[in-house]
């Protein structure tokens, strides 16, 4: 058995040929004996073993019977082990190790083989202190360049080789892991509970619908166009929120630090600043802004109503905008980059490819700042709701998305190549074309948009003028796939400077320039492509971290179009009486076009008419199409559908003006429809509420009951970032029995509960209660209205949907969302 054990030991350690020799095979016993200094520290038996090295009582490893159990393996890994035989060896055995390894001065080969083991073990075991260069080389040669942990090596002579290997592999792996410090991930998400409340709430119930109308209205130059943040900040909000939640991705830690900061900063935005407010909303949607703003006078959307009427002009009211847009020198300069961004593949809208085929998105252009249409309504909304969203911020994903943080930040998409843009639709979008605009648009600034992952990434600078433009006849790299520029084979002359930013191959393939932020990495979870703001969704097809705008032209010559339904539910609950619940639901439908479409229209002055059909419109009332851009067929017999077609000359003129005013925009949002949904009282509210106050001179008891209502939604989806905010007066001195835990703002005297999400999967099927008792110094308290805020993605309350009619266009993305506007409950 001794020989067998010896053989196994040699195999396990990868002993050299010398060990394999029969002489060395017999020597292991003595080897185990020779390192008497090594064995002595471990146990007296070890000494006996060394002294009686030749005794038959010793086992093949040179240790007496029962020695295995006596060995303290933990000591091998510790400095003591180093001090022990092997650790001490550096002093005397340095040379002897080499000697013993090759041949020991002692005649017995057993000692040699044992020394070999010692040498191997020592370098690995005491690699920090006791390593000998010669020993290391020898070990590498014998072991095959495999470093063994000190403990496994020492163990091997005394234990079976199999055990040694196991220990070795595990310890080696474990030790480096332990030794490697992992950077601490800190998620910064300052939540100013008080700041975001006002922005979170929609317009007053009576003015909610009017507000939408007013928002829709714009000056013709900016008709329906409210600056929409082009940057895919939306993705960053996701990240930001997940990190703030305290779940930053563990690895790699290096990437984490960057992400958390961005998440943290936006939260502290004041409502006064549009961007700040937007950031706050993104990361702090759950956070509540000043209660006063909510309950105090709210800017009435009605104030904007005047503009609404002006804005909604009949087509008969012709304006210079109606003229077919021609590229002006300025537009040519600016547009070419955008055009380059635009798929060059599509010579004309005429050849309809599969509508969904438009997947390779790509509105891009030097215009990093997407300025969808600047809408007065948006501004009004901002003022009214105090939930202001900057164009850049609008691109940010909805609060929920932020929370998803995604859950983790998706790896930057691969550099967008025209091949990728043309050949494949956006990865994430449901249509498949939903990939973000950035990827497909070479024109987008080369600057990495990854920073955009921060709550409010700065817009990438426009293409530097120094960059040479390709001659009109010279196609750029990937030109074929560029979305909106005419195909190379197209009869129409190539756009001026067709490549713009994409001119350089590096800008196209560079991970830093386009791939990081603009690569088409839109994922299904990237619902963040649309930002929800105060009951209004903004399409953010350019996802800095998520990917390029889905609005890029596909290889099938269809123009990509994205649509978003955004609905706001306003409700007022009085006590526990369902009959006293007042509900008002408003919505809007927005179409988004890639910036490069302006060049496409310039090259194709007579594009195919864009016609679409709204499905499940029977629940809609007071439908208000954009009078300057939409025409409706009122003779339809089907009451459940409504068909609309776009006034293309007006649309082209409008998009041209927007491109001139905001050359850095990568896409343009155009409000098409405003509508109000027929409500059925409390049954139409996704979250039913009941509040009960008990006010006494010395204390106040508050109870809030809520219930998730799936019947109100076309598809049951979770309510995200649910917040309950209640002001408490009477000089609160102490909180008692607060369940679940809540945040108390002593300065503003209000309490805030935050629930990440409520759905059927929640405890008790989404039914719950919030309890709190307040000790008062100046009671009794006066009951105040409860303010609730939430958002939801993937469904609408109206159940409306949209489909294209005819050829030439394809939906790259259809977004559906709803959120709480003025959602109140009183005692």
Swiss-Prot record:
Specifically expressed in brain. Also detected at lower levels in spleen and adipose tissue. Keywords: Coated pit, Endocytosis, Membrane, Phosphoprotein. Residues 335-345, 436-455, 481-491 have a biased composition (Low complexity). Residues 245-260, 346-369, 456-474 have a biased composition (Pro residues). InterPro entries: AP2_Mu_C_sf, MHD, Muniscin_C, SGIP1_MHD. The modification Phosphothreonine is found at residues 180, 182, 247, 259, 324, 328, 335, 409. CDD domains: SGIP1_MHD. The modification Phosphoserine is found at residues 78, 104-105, 107, 149, 151, 156, 169, 236, 265, 287, 289, 300, 316, 319, 371, 398, 485. Signal peptide: none annotated. GO terms for biological process: clathrin coat assembly; clathrin-dependent endocytosis; energy homeostasis; positive regulation of feeding behavior; positive regulation of receptor-mediated endocytosis; response to dietary excess; response to starvation; synaptic vesicle endocytosis. Residues 560-566, 592-594, 666-669, 812-817 are annotated as: Interaction with DPF motifs-containing proteins. One of its GO terms (molecular function) is microtubule binding. Residues 558-826 form the MHD domain. Its main location: membrane. It is found in: Membrane, Clathrin-coated pit. Residues 16-32, 40-53, 319-333, 377-392 have a biased composition (Basic and acidic residues). Residues 265-276 have a biased composition (Polar residues). Residues 1-116, 143-199, 223-278, 315-505 are annotated as: Disordered. Residues 648-827 are annotated as: Necessary and sufficient to mediate interaction with CANX. GO terms for cellular component: AP-2 adaptor complex; clathrin-coated vesicle; cytoplasm; plasma membrane; presynapse. It is a peripheral membrane protein. Pfam families: muHD. Brain-specific depletion by RNAi leads to body weight reduction due to reduction of food intake without concomitant reduction in metabolic rate. Interacts with proteins essential or regulating the formation of functional clathrin-coated pits. Interacts with CANX. Interacts with AP2A1. Interacts with EPS15. Interacts with SH3GL3. Interacts with AMPH. Interacts with ITSN1 (via SH3 domains). Interacts with and REPS1. May function in clathrin-mediated endocytosis. Has both a membrane binding/tubulating activity and the ability to recruit proteins essential to the formation of functional clathrin-coated pits. Has a preference for membranes enriched in phosphatidylserine and phosphoinositides and is required for the endocytosis of the transferrin receptor. May also bind tubulin. May play a role in the regulation of energy homeostasis. This is SH3-containing GRB2-like protein 3-interacting protein 1.
């Amino acid at each position: 058995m001794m020989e067998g054990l010896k053989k196994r030991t040699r195999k396990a350690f990868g002993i050299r040929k010398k060990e394999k020799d029969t002489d060395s095979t017999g020597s292991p016993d003595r080897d185990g004996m020779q390192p008497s200094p090594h064995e002595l520290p471990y146990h007296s038996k070890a000494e006996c073993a060394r002294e009686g090295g030749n005794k038959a009582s010793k086992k093949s490893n040179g240790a007496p019977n029962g020695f295995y159990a006596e060995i303290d393996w933990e000591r091998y890994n510790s400095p003591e082990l180093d001090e022990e035989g092997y650790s001490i060896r550096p002093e005397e055995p340095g040379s002897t190790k080499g000697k013993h390894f090759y041949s020991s001065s002692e005649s017995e080969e057993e000692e040699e083989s044992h020394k070999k083991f010692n040498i191997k073990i020592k370098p690995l075991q005491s690699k920090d202190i006791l390593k000998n260069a010669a020993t290391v080389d020898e070990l590498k040669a014998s072991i095959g360049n495999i470093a063994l942990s000190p403990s496994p090596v020492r163990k091997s002579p005394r234990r079976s080789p199999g055990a040694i290997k196991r220990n070795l592999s595990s310890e080696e792996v474990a030790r480096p892991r332990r030794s490697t410090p992992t950077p601490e991930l800190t998620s910064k998400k300052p939540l100013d509970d008080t700041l975001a409340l006002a922005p979170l709430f929609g317009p007053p119930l009576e003015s909610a619908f009017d507000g939408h109308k007013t928002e829709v209205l714009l000056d013709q130059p900016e008709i329906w166009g409210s600056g929409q943040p082009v940057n895919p900040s939306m993705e960053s909000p996701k990240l930001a929120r997940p990190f703030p939640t305290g779940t930053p991705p563990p690895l790699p830690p290096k990437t984490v630090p960057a992400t958390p900061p961005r998440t943290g900063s936006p939260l502290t935005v004041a409502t006064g600043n549009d961007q700040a407010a937007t950031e706050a909303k993104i990361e702090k949607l759950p956070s509540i802004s000043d209660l006063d703003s909510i309950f105090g006078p709210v800017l009435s959307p009605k104030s904007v109503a005047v503009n609404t009427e002006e804005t909604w002009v009949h087509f008969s009211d012709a304006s210079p905008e109606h003229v077919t847009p021609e590229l002006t020198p300025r537009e040519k300069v600016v547009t070419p980059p955008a055009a380059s961004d635009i798929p060059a593949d599509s010579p004309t809208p005429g050849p309809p490819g599969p509508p969904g085929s438009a997947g390779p998105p790509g509105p891009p252009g030097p215009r990093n700042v997407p300025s969808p249409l600047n809408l007065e309504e948006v501004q009004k909304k901002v003022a009214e709701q105090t939930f202001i969203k900057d164009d850049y911020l609008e691109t940010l994903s909805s609060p929920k998305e932020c929370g998803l943080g995604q859950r983790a930040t998706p790896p930057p998409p691969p550099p967008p190549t025209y091949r990728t843009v043309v050949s494949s639709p956006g990865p994430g979008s449901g249509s498949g074309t939903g990939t973000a605009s950035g990827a497909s648009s070479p024109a987008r600034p080369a600057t990495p948009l990854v920073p955009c992952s921060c709550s409010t990434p700065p817009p990438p600078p426009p293409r530097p003028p120094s960059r040479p433009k390709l001659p009109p006849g010279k196609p750029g790299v990937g030109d074929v796939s560029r979305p909106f520029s005419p195909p190379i084979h197209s009869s129409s002359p190539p756009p001026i400077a067709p490549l713009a930013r994409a001119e350089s191959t590096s800008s196209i393939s560079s991970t830093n320039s386009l791939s990081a932020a603009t690569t088409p990495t839109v994922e299904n979870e990237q619902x963040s492509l649309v930002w929800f703001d105060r009951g209004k969704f903004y399409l953010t097809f350019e996802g800095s971290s998520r990917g390029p705008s889905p609005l890029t032209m596909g290889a099938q010559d269809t123009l990509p179009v994205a649509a978003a339904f955004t609905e706001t539910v306003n409700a007022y609950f009085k006590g526990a009486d369902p009959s006293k619940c007042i509900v008002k639901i408003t919505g809007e439908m927005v179409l988004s076009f890639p910036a490069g479409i302006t060049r496409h229209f310039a090259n194709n002055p007579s594009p195919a008419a864009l016609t679409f059909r709204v499905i499940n419109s029977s629940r809609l009332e007071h439908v208000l199409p954009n009078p300057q851009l939409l025409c409706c067929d009122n003779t339809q017999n089907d009451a459940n559908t409504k068909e609309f077609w776009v006034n293309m000359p007006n649309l082209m003129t409008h998009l041209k003006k927007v491109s001139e005013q905001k050359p850095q925009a990568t896409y343009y949002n155009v409000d098409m429809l405003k509508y109000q949904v027929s409500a059925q009282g409390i049954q139409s509210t996704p979250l039913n509420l009941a509040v009960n106050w008990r006010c006494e001179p010395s204390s106040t008891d508050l109870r809030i009951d809520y219930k998730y209502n799936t019947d109100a939604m076309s598809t049951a989806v979770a309510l995200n970032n649910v917040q309950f905010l209640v002001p408490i007066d009477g000089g609160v001195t102490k909180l008692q029995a607060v369940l679940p835990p809540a945040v108390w703002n002593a300065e503003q005297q209000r309490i805030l509960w935050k629930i990440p999400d409520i759905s059927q999967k929640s405890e008790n099927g989404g039914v719950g209660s919030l309890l709190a008792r307040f000790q008062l110094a100046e009671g009794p308290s006066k009951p105040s209205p409860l303010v609730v805020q939430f958002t939801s993605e993937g469904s609408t309350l109206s159940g409306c949907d949209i489909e294209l009619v005819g050829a030439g266009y394809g939906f790259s993305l259809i977004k559906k969302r709803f959120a709480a506007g003025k959602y109140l409950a009183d005692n």
